[in-house]
Amino acid sequence: MNLETIYDDYLERLQEERKELYKGYEKWFSGSSAGSCYKKQWYKINEFEAEPFDARTKRLLRLGTIVHADFEKAIHEAEPQDNVKVLLEHEVKIPELNIVGHLDHCLLRNDGKNTEIYISDLKTLAQYSWTSKFGRNAKKASINSVQQSFGHYELQVATYALGILKEVMADDLADFNTSKINFDIEQILHNISINIIWYSKNDSKMKTTEISTDALHAALAYWNGLNDFINEDNLIETIPPNGAIGIPMQDWECRYCQHSKICKGS
């Protein structure tokens, strides 16, 4: 009996079950892919078959899933607070931008006049990623930096925040395809707190960082740019890596892309 094989087969079954969550949304973008390469997104909505993850990657992803499940259970079993609604693994949709996804945690407090929204997304990090983000050199770079930038994780949770805003504050927001949406977002920024909970897989350290609400505008700009690029029919399949802005978004993407074998351009 090979226990590694048994476990890997189990993870494969779980992955197939998870696909059921997105059945019917095959041609939608995933909120978790915010900030990704435009061509990778194009492959996804056109249902090109991706290279499967290797066994090691599946195990790493499973560790993150287990920690997520623990957090959800802890929040679910916590003492309820007055006037607070708790959303866990909540589906968010923004049809105007062709986005669907699942937000980890959202707390909604309504006092009868105002709605306050607290959003958090849990991210598990390996040692190198944790040190890169929170180590001494990272702190020094942060102090010396004067430019606000948002990475993949920040854009992801900001995308979920946009979906929640659309769902619970629809009367305050314009259509997401209009230029007025940026103005409308500015009017409700005091209602929302966007956060990432970081969990070290190496030593179980945890940190929570609040993300600037500027990330809402950055996420909106990314998704509008992606939709515009794809709708313009730029013969995307023929564009090689670095052949256009957004292909890829970051240099490291190609090394881990599940479509790298077919992404050669012409």
Give residue spans per PLM region.
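A short beta-strand motif that forms part of the nucleic acid-binding face
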Residues: 123-126, 200
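Short, glycine/acidic-rich beta->alpha junctions
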Residues: 97-98, 151-156
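A solvent-exposed, charged loop/short amphipathic helix patch at secondary-structure junctions
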Residues: 129-146
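Conserved aromatic-histidine-acidic binding/catalytic patches
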Residues: 55, 59, 63, 145-152, ...
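Metal-dependent nuclease catalytic regions and adjoining charged, substrate-binding loops involved
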Residues: 5, 147-151, 162-266
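Metal-dependent nuclease catalytic cores that hydrolyze phosphodiester bonds in DNA/RNA
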Residues: 1-119, 126-134
